[in-house]
Amino acid sequence: MVDMDEYLYLVEDNSLKDYLSDKNFEKCDFIKFNWAISTDNNLVHYDNRSLLERFKYPFLKDKFVKTMIRGNISDLKYWVHSPNISPLRNISCINTGEKIITNKVHIESVKPINLEKAFIIHFRFKSTEELINKFKRGYSNWFGNNIINFLKANLGDYFDQNKITLEKINYVEKELKFNLWYYRIRYYFCKILFFDKVCYA
């Protein structure tokens, strides 16, 4: 259900067993959890403190979900975030226990976004340096082995979800030999528009 950079966060319960004991989940085959994405907290370089110490800024709410699946479902096919099975099995729940009745249980987004009882924390961008190291380790076939598409997609998401600063831009350009003129223009535009305050993209 979760990747190595994701964690299930329980707001009220001390264990997954306690959380699942809620009677609202008794007839659900799937539980859908919204993402909450952590920003880089303006960390350019790797910081060896614990995640809870490093990331104090509010999480960014996200409509996309990851799905917890009940065992012993034989007709299950899995695709990225959510299951896809026979239309006959059509009861799923959001994390509060509220039911979603649909024959499209593979839906990958749930609105309104609800982080009331549980959610998936996605530590996607922990620092600029760690993002660069990810690039240098290589990339998957998701982008058709096209490094330019990979860089554009990930850098675009990074600067859309984190504060743009000259320090970050300069570091990326230095390490990747990649011209970020577009983000440099956005940085100065924000600086002028918001009276010298560094803004989110």
Question: What kind of region is each of these model predictions?
Answer:
Residues 10-201:
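Catalytic-site signature of metal-activated, phosphate-bearing donor transferases
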Residues 1-9:
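Short beta-strand-to-loop acidic/aromatic patch adjacent to the donor-nucleotide binding site
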